[in-house]
Amino acid sequence: MHQSYKAFMIILVVCSSLTMYFTQTDNTKTYAFSDQVIQQGAVGEDVIELQARLQYLGFYNGKIDGVFGWGTYWALRNFQYEFGMEIDGLAGQTTKDKLVQASNYDKEYVTEQINKGNQFTHYGGGDRNTDGQSNSGGGSGNSGEDTGGTPSVNVPQGYSQNDIQLMANAVYGEARGEPYEGQVAVAAVILNRLNSALFPDTVSGVIFEPRAFTAVADGQIWLEPNDKAREAVLDAINGWDPSGNALYYFNPDTATSGWIWTRPQIKQIGKHIFCK
């Protein structure tokens, strides 16, 4: 009788311990997204978590405010690219799962800072920046979202609608039929030249520099670009550079310049070889 009672108590203790373990595990489970697909224009807690996790990983540099604007959209696309996912700018279940796996989210801290109106960051691997001051008094800091005015066309800061159109023309003329990544890479080369002292400092100057682009020489620059070409330009402007910081590219099947073969090669995407 005594032995039976003792065995019963041991089993009871073990079961109680397991129950407490799983209860605690469930209670301390990392907060994660709801089931909705989060997309541009969305607002609320899911967007706050999305922005915080993207910022934790270094993809989002804007204000964590729960508003899914352009800054959040492009940060999400860059995350999807870097993690080898479908690049659609939508936070579906696969993307959310990968974000949860790759980042941490301190919901209590973020919620507290937002409720207090503080300026703060949520970057991983470093001290958080909280100045304790409200954002309600204005300020000149760039939030990473389109907060100023209401432009008729969404154009990234620093570029005119004409710049976007001209670059889309160049990408379409130079790289239509190439993989999307290759089209973004061509747009990135234009931007890399724009930021190099070796080339003109305007989009039109780079594109129309003599003998710079085949599409200008053969007139294909004036073909009407499709939406994919424009999207490739916007992806490049917002930080995606599949070219590896290339300044040149060429098609080895059609290149007639011996000089281009002397350039250090970075990679090949589709039919184009990208070079330093």
Swiss-Prot record:
Keywords assigned by UniProt, alphabetized: Cell wall biogenesis/degradation, Germination, Hydrolase, Signal, Sporulation
Transmembrane segments: none
Signal peptide coordinates: 1-25
Pfam families, per database record: Hydrolase_2, PG_binding_1
Listed GO MF terms: hydrolase activity
Keyword Ribosomal protein attributed: no
Stretch list, region Disordered: 118-158
Example GO BP: sporulation resulting in formation of a cellular spore
Record-linked InterPro entries: Cell_wall_hydrolase_SleB, Peptidoglycan-bd-like, PGBD-like_sf, PGBDSf, SleB_dom1, Spore_cortex_SleB
Function field: Required for spore cortex hydrolysis during germination.
Similarity comment: family membership: Belongs to the SleB family.
Protein's name in the database: Spore cortex-lytic enzyme
Annotated source species: Oceanobacillus iheyensis (strain DSM 14371 / CIP 107618 / JCM 11309 / KCTC 3954 / HTE831)
